[in-house]
Regions:
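Cysteine-centered catalytic environments shared across enzyme families
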Residues: 1-230, 243
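Glycine-rich active-site loop/lid subdomains used to bind and stabilize high-energy intermediates
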Residues: 39, 98, 185, 191-194, ...
Length: 308
């Protein structure tokens, strides 16, 4: 499995030896949840599929509450919020037999000094990024890209567009906008400018077939419940509902869409990498609002020391 290059999650049942093998890709892109109950193992790519089994109840224990209110929408690798439901952590394998359960990590990022020059490092990163994108363009289903006009999605779309041109094709790109956005938009640390202008500029430059999906506020609100059900746990409210509606629109014509999600974690795109107040915080940047989150809990649950 160390030789696998790509995203995956799979389960193999060895009937002869009476054991089950589960594995997940290095970054944990593909989900794989499981529950072990009364010598039975239930596994699925979604939590809701496991909860559909009557042996598993939809219960959230103390650990789940802590995960949700201290780290949400992120989750500690291996956790799944619900009691008696776990996930195979990224880059992990598990073997379940009648005798025991074995779990091990087959890969992890090594921490070592980079002796490359700035120019060499830049070229190395470029080679890896281009290779990763081109690998995702191989398939027998229609492929498009998300394009917000930011660095990450623009780089992906530009590389994909060039590859499509080499095949005699035109790349389709999609961006999202909101009704009356030009009237109500306010700059923030996470979004200093509106997407539409820059997305259109990039689309024009790379000569893609671009579509701007416009959503209204009423639809965003109405989709909040569906978005939460789709994720199986509470997430980022309107961010999730807008993504759900955006993907539904794209799904009318495309099965696969490449996006710049998670590039901020790799290339330092979040404000807490540079904002002094966030850097000087005594906790994780995403956990600074724990007090506000706890305010909606009932008095019994408030006693949990979520901060720890």
């Amino acid at each position: 499995i160390k030789k696998f290059n790509g995203i995956f999650a799979f389960v193999i049942y060895d009937e002869d030896k009476g054991r089950v093998f589960l594995a997940r890709d290095q970054m944990g892109v593909k989900p794989l949840f499981y529950s072990i109950n009364n010598k039975n193992i239930i596994f699925a790519s979604e939590i809701k599929a496991i909860l559909a089994n009557p042996m598993v109840k939809a219960q959230v224990d103390r650990d789940g509450i802590t995960e949700l209110f201290a780290l949400g929408p992120a989750v500690t690798p291996g956790k799944a919020i619900y009691k008696n439901i776990s996930e195979i952590a990224p880059a992990n394998c598990m073997v379940i037999s009648k005798e025991n359960i074995k779990v091990w990590e087959y890969w992890k990022v090594s921490l070592e000094e980079n002796k490359e020059t700035v120019e060499e490092a830049a070229e190395h990163v470029r080679t890896l990024v281009v290779d990763a994108i081109k690998r995702q363009l191989v398939g027998d289903v229609p492929i498009c890209t998300f394009l917000s006009g930011g660095l990450d999605s623009s780089a992906i779309s530009a590389i994909a567009a060039e590859e499509f041109r080499n095949r005699g094709k035109v790349l389709d790109t999609y961006s999202i906008d909101y009704k009356d956005n030009e009237k109500y938009f306010k700059s923030s640390l996470f979004q200093p400018t509106s997407d539409k202008y820059w997305a259109c500029k990039v689309a024009e430059f790379i000569k893609s077939n671009h579509k701007n999906v416009v959503l209204n506020h009423k639809d965003l609100v109405l989709a909040l419940r569906d978005a939460t059900l789709a994720r199986d746990i509470p997430g980022m409210a309107d961010v999730d509902s807008s993504l759900l509606l955006f993907c539904k629109e794209i799904r009318k014509d495309f099965v696969v869409g490449l996006s710049g999600e998670c590039a901020d974690e790799i290339f330092g795109g979040y404000p807490w990498y540079t904002n002094e107040d966030m850097l000087n915080s005594e906790t994780f940047p995403w956990s600074r609002s724990v007090g506000m989150r706890k305010s909606i809990l009932n008095e019994k649950i408030k006693k949990f020391n979520i901060e720890e």
